[in-house]
Amino acid sequence: MERITVTLGERSYPITIAAGLFDDSASFMPLKAGEQAMLVTNQTLAPLYLDRVRGVLENSGVHVDQVILPDGEQYKSLTVLDQVFSALLAKPHGRDTTIVALGGGVIGDLAGFAAASYQRGVRFIQVPTTLLSQVDSSVGGKTAVNHPLGKNMIGAFYQPVSVVIDLDCLKSLPARELSSGLAEVIKYGIILDRDFFLWLEENIEAVRELQPDALAYCIRRCCEIKAAVVAADERESGMRALLNLGHTYGHAIEAEMGYGNWLHGEAVAAGMVMAAHTARRLGQFSAEDVERVKSLLVRAGLPVNGPTQMAPEAYLPHMMRDKKVLAGELRLVLPTAIGQSEVRGGVAHDMVLASIADCLA
């Protein structure tokens, strides 16, 4: 068992990583006998894990209710969020309840935002079941729903009280979803940890095959990096913005193509290559390193080109709604070397468009 702490003073919390955590009620601390919990999951995961998690909580004396939501990025919306609020109010649940988010990034983001909003804030526990949510979205307190005009535009910073990562969940994860998560894994190596990038170049196939030692190290290292970044910059006023490598381009793909048609990690993968080409055109990232990034993404089962039906000009309106835009100026996360990156403003739109065009299949 691995345990990592996200250090935020009185709001610090543990990330627990191991196989078989769903069978141990201690995994869901600080929930205890006599307390209420609302278990939030989706229609795909409910048959796999709902009875198991609910059972271990009820056997420990927790009073559990549940809400099962539709599955997919297109359902990370205010309309579906209202279903969670309605379920909480119907029982009813008070300010001492705990929301348990059992699912991937959509469930974690949506249930977390429900926790941040319901009665001005209740506890919640992240129980991520996809690789992407285990290595990224469950850690750090970003919660949100989407708007038709932009991804994650309605949300809050709100930290969980714990993150429970059961490695056994990945055994049921479709290969495409696993690859989607690997985009965020590779991102950490590009932006902050050259040694981890080199390790991935040697071990990416072992991770895709779910070899236990490689998988455990991969998830642990990602959580260590994310925890350190969040502890240093919880509200993304500085270095935390580096975690958005590829996301400004990728969110444009998701919004333009329709949420769910491109998985988040797929869009981020293409976006990271676009960012790499932008950095190359600026003279701060070598063509050789662009190819190394592309090669690793391909080996991870990810796209390195944007959608053919999306012209470069279609990206900019979405990119200008990005949360890093300041005073109308587009700001991009760009690599400066493998393991190093920066937030850069003032990049000419023509250069951005040319870099996107570099990535059209």
From Swiss-Prot:
Name of the gene this protein is made from: aroB
Cofactor: Co(2+); Zn(2+); NAD(+)
Keywords: Amino-acid biosynthesis, Aromatic amino acid biosynthesis, Cobalt, Cytoplasm, Lyase, Metal-binding, NAD, Nucleotide-binding, Zinc
Purpose of the protein: Catalyzes the conversion of 3-deoxy-D-arabino-heptulosonate 7-phosphate (DAHP) to dehydroquinate (DHQ).
Signal peptide start and end residues: none
Amino acids binding Zn(2+): 184, 247, 264
Organism ancestry: Bacteria, Pseudomonadati, Pseudomonadota, Gammaproteobacteria, Enterobacterales
Cofactor binding notes: Binds 1 divalent metal cation per subunit. Can use either Co(2+) or Zn(2+).
SUPFAM superfamilies per record: Dehydroquinate synthase-like
Pathway assigned to this chain's UniProt record: Metabolic intermediate biosynthesis; chorismate biosynthesis; chorismate from D-erythrose 4-phosphate and phosphoenolpyruvate: step 2/7
The family this protein is said to belong to: Belongs to the sugar phosphate cyclases superfamily. Dehydroquinate synthase family.
GO biological process, one term: aromatic amino acid family biosynthetic process
Cellular localization per UniProt: Cytoplasm
Enzyme Commission number: 4.2.3.4
Gene3D superfamilies named among the record's database cross-references: 3.40.50.1970, Dehydroquinate synthase-like - alpha domain
Binding site for NAD(+): 71-76, 105-109, 129-130, 142, 151
GO cellular component term, pick one: cytoplasm
Protein's name according to its UniProt entry: 3-dehydroquinate synthase
Taxonomic source organism: Pectobacterium carotovorum subsp. carotovorum (strain PC1)
Catalytic reactions on record: 7-phospho-2-dehydro-3-deoxy-D-arabino-heptonate = 3-dehydroquinate + phosphate
A molecular function (GO) term: nucleotide binding
